[in-house]
Every structure is written in C-alpha cells, then in structure tokens.
Amino acid sequence: LRKIIHVDCDAFFAAIEMRDDPSLANRPMAVGGLAEQRGVIATCNYEARAYGVRSAMASAHALKLCPDLLIVRPRREAYREASQEIHTIFRTYTDLIEPLSLDEAFLDVTGCEHFAGSATRIAQDIRRRVWQQLRITVSAGVAPNKFLAKIASDWKKPDGLFVITPAQVDEFVLGLPVTKLHGVGRVTAEKLQRMGIRTCADLRTRNRLDLLRDFGSFGERLWGLAHGIDERPVQVESRRQSVSVENTYDRDLPDLAACLERLPELLQELTRRMARLDSRYRPGKPFVKLKFHDFTQTTLEQSGAGLELEDYADLLAVAFARGKRPVRLIGVGVRLIDSRDQAEQLRLF
C-alpha cells in the first residue's frame, strides 16, 4: 500500500501578505487586481471568505459583498520564494513530489524512513516546520492514494490534518458526494444526479458495464473512485534546478561567527543529498541563503567557486554583510547542470 500526503497552503498569497504586513491581519483582505481595472481576486483570507468573497471572483463584485475589503496587488516573486522554501522542506522526506501549483503538492512517502515510516508523523512534521520557518499554516491529508489525500487535506482546513487509513477507506468513500470525485465537473455531476446518483454509495449500485455504457471510458474511472481506487502515480518534476539544505534555528544566530559554526553540519547534509542525485546531474554554482530575524532574506551565488567549506564560508560572510542582523535561517545549496541539456546543444550544432 502507498502512503500519499497532499499538502495545501491555507490562503497562500494572502498568508504571505499578512505575514509581511501584520496590519493586514484580522481584517478582510484579498490579493488580486483592482476593481477599476476589471481585476479578479486571486485569493483572500478567511475573514473575507466569511462575506462570500472567493478566488476567481471579479474584484468589483467582491467589494459589493464586502465594502471594507482591502485588495493588494500580487507579489509573485515573494510567493515563488516561499514555495521554494516549502519544497526544500518536502525534499527532506522524499524526492517523489508532484507540484500542482505554488501552494500545493502531492508527496509519496511510501519508502520514507523518517519517523519509522509513519506518514501521519511526517505530515505533522511538515506542518510544524512550515510554520516555524515561514510563519504560514498548511493543511495536509494522508491517504493510500492521491484522490483521497486531496480530499483529506480539505477536510479540516485551515491549519488541519486529516488521515484516512486503508481500513477506513471503504466507509469514508461511501458517504462522499459524487461532486467530490476527481474529474467530475458540473456536467457529469448533473448527469449523475438525473440518474439518481448523488453519493458514492449510489454509484456503487451500478456495475461497470452500465457506467461504461453511460460515460464511456470515464465510467471505468468512476467505478474505481467509488470504491476508493486511484492508481495514479505521483508525477515527479522531470528536472531539478538545485539541491539545498536549510535550517531554521530556535534562537536567532546573533552574528557571523555563530552562523559559521553551523556551516559544517549543513554541508554534511548537502553532501548526503547530492549523493542521492541521478547521475545525469553535476554540480554548478554554490549558493547560500540567509533569512534575518525580521524575515527579510538574501541569496548569494558565485560562478567558478568551489564546493568546499571555505567557499561557502566566503559566500556566507558576504551574505551576512548585506543585513548585519540576527539570522533565523541558513540555507546552503548548489545549482545543478543537467547533462541532457548539453547533449541537446551538441545535436543542434
């Protein structure tokens, strides 16, 4: 049996904005385009959702529902940086990661040895580390397949964890409305309802041949989902851009000397992760990342530099000089060169 975790950040864009500007918290706010420019809401916080504001809603309509709604423009680079930090945490546990967007992903932790292979404890630790490192919350679902893990992550949102064990699958699926099934959109849901099928229990009363006749090849999928079956694998990103290690410290590191003391253990873990890489990758530029106590951060990389302790120490010193403030997080890594890219260049010429 597989162990799949679906991780979904809670109101991701809005959470980043509220973290970086605490004056936005505890009031209805959204990230999106301006109403006068026919903008659309990208996401909103839970205070705004209480008024009926939703993603993909026209900003003008959102303001009618909630006249006090504050709409801020998106800062996509900040969201990408946060997403990369979260994926660095994911890679501590597994390389089998399928990103669905900046703020959600599937993880296959079937072969993971952390916490004696407990997917529940891994999900708990991911949630703890994301909060500790980024000060935003994520919800997680744990189940034997992707379909159920995604439903589970939404079950106790926000800031929740829900687990569906193999023994619980049958009972859980029976009560699900068909609108929760992966691939069932409005048209299919309406057709099912006209047939008197509203839940998976209803769907199970139909045999495979009936469903194939009524829905074509999708009927086979419907039958499987109604029985809690979903064999889709976690689709791993085809190419990695870098490998890195980050650590957030319980107490801020006060000066450069304290940061340098932490470097050897980080590089030891980086070496271990690089040894697990596919042979098609070779190391490129080293880089370091610092997040200061006020959540500002800087990243520095250097072409032609080596991958030894002294090389990273030099980069760390320059990065620290940019802020000269207590440090809450240190990251070290190396950009990767994919040999397939070079082979493609040779064929071109």
Q: Which ranges hold each PLM region?
A:
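DNA-contacting surface of Y-family translesion DNA polymerases
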Residues: 6, 180, 190-329, 339-343
